[in-house]
Amino acid sequence: MLYYMSNFTLSDSFLLKIFSNKNSRLFEEAGNHVLKENSGSKDQVGIIYNDYNADPKMVDAWQKETKGMSVYYVAPRSKTLRMDAKVLFAKKMKESQYVPKTYFGYDEIPTDTPDNALFFVKKNGSTGSRGVDIHAYSAMKDLDYTERVVQQNMNVPDLYDDKRYKIRAYVVLHDKNVFLFNKSFATVASEDYKEAVGDMDQEALRKMHVIFQTSGTKFILSEELDKFELVQQNMLVACKDFKNVYRDEIKRIEANEYAILGFDFVVDSEGGVQIIEINHRSNYAHPKVMENKVDVPLLK
């Protein structure tokens, strides 16, 4: 879906200037909310969200155009690449208890692993479900592991309406700090969950376990989950662990920079969580309810 870049100014004594080249409609909607809430303020603020890196010439031009304007812009991709890239993320977080058991080749997997144990094999650089396969251990010996990450499937996942789900939570990095946004949503698998017994073909496994966005994907607000309060607490703890592991990278996020990270969590039957991947340039194309309840409040 194509979104045209937009550059617009909102003012009611409080001055807010916004540039976005990704779903600018949501940024404008969030900006109007901010404008109403800060009516009468004399602050002058600029926000730049670029899917690549902010143009320093734009920052300079805004500050020259409006003396005293505070301009905040998305952190350069180089500062968050080790969070976003699948192989780099896996290597960095491998020892954390808040990610799946992680391997980079068949020979690393313990030999006493049950034949029907499932593993996700993810190709570096893939987006969404593209480049993600799921295999039983018995079928993995001859796979290609070049530039791939192997994550072991959790044994007993939590279910929604008898199906697996994946939570998308937003984490904001700003001025060396980490913030977990308190609203999130989940996407639900297309097929009911069944334990892997005997041979199951790749397509059947994908429909149960590889959860991705299509025109027919079911979205729910995370607060609809039975264990939501516990899951929310555990996501916060996982984010604290992330902050510790990535402390050097987070220290590089300056006072005038921010990053909005999309954390994908899976949840077990006890409400425990695992971060399966992080996206440092999220896609905000979601159903209207998710936009109104999660995306716009986040951007605001």
Language-model-detected regions and their locations in the chain:
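A residue-level signal for conserved active-site and pocket-lining positions in enzyme catalytic cores
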Residues: 89, 93, 169, 278
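A short acidic/small-residue loop/turn micro-motif
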Residues: 281-283
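Conserved N-proximal alpha/beta basic substrate-recognition cap immediately N-terminal to
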Residues: 3-118, 125-127
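Catalytic core of tubulin tyrosine ligase-like
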Residues: 116, 124-259, 268-273, 279, ...
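Hydrophobic residue at the +6 position relative to the catalytic HRD Asp in the kinase catalytic loop
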Residues: 263-265
